[in-house]
């Protein structure tokens, strides 16, 4: 901090924004839990987050579960949608053609711009409830493969996907090494 006097201020502002996001996310989960159409809400903490903290924040809410078991792709695959704010799981959900709901309740300076450009962007609790319930109601009518045959432009600029398995590509690289 001695070399850059603005660095301390930036770190404090980033941390304050993170705490505000957590507070708003908890409010959103509690709001959805009371006003939803009968679905359960799974909160999967980031690997760097303390799961016990989330369990304390969300305890005694019957249809909310804090779970970190297994790989994220299984949870994405078995969900009807993914709600997030600044989470790279939105990228995985988009690639998997799973509906993504990006909840941005206030202007954020330090958030992941790529992840927050994906999915249905909502700013208020009422917008969030309407979008989540709409996705839930129409989930059986939507063929997930029809959510879009191509990825959003923002991801096409960042990802290259083809039909070749990663293991096959590695073998080809190894075979080229003399």
Language model regions located:
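Structural alpha-helical scaffold elements that stabilize or flank donor/cofactor-binding regions
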Residues: 74-76, 114
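Catalytic binding pocket for nucleotide-activated donors in carbohydrate/polymer assembly enzymes
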Residues: 7, 55-61, 88-162
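Acidic donor-binding loop of glycosyltransferase active sites
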Residues: 77-84
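Active-site donor-binding acidic/aromatic loop of nucleotide-activated sugar
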Residues: 62-69
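Conserved catalytic-core segment of nucleotide-activated headgroup transferases in glycan assembly
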Residues: 1-57
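C-terminal alpha-helical cap of glycosyltransferases
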Residues: 160-178
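Short acidic active-site motifs
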Residues: 70-74, 127
């Amino acid at each position: 901090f001695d070399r850059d006097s603005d660095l301390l201020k930036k770190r404090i502002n980033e941390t304050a924004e993170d705490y505000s996001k957590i507070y708003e996310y908890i409010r959103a989960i509690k709001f959805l839990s009371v006003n939803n159409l009968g679905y359960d809400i799974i909160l999967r903490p980031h690997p760097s987050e303390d799961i016990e903290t989330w369990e304390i924040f969300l305890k005694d809410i019957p249809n909310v579960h804090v779970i970190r078991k297994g790989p994220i792709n299984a949870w994405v695959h078995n969900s009807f949608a993914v709600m997030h704010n600044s989470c790279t799981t939105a990228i995985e959900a988009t690639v998997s053609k799973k509906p993504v709901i990006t909840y941005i309740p206030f202007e954020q300076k330090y958030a992941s711009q790529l992840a927050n450009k994906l999915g249905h962007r909502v700013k208020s609790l009422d917008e969030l409830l309407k979008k989540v319930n709409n996705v839930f109601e129409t989930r059986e009518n939507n063929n997930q493969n029809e959510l879009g045959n191509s990825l959003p432009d923002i991801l096409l600029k960042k990802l290259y996907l083809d039909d070749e398995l990663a293991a096959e590509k590695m073998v080809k690289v190894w075979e080229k090494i003399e």
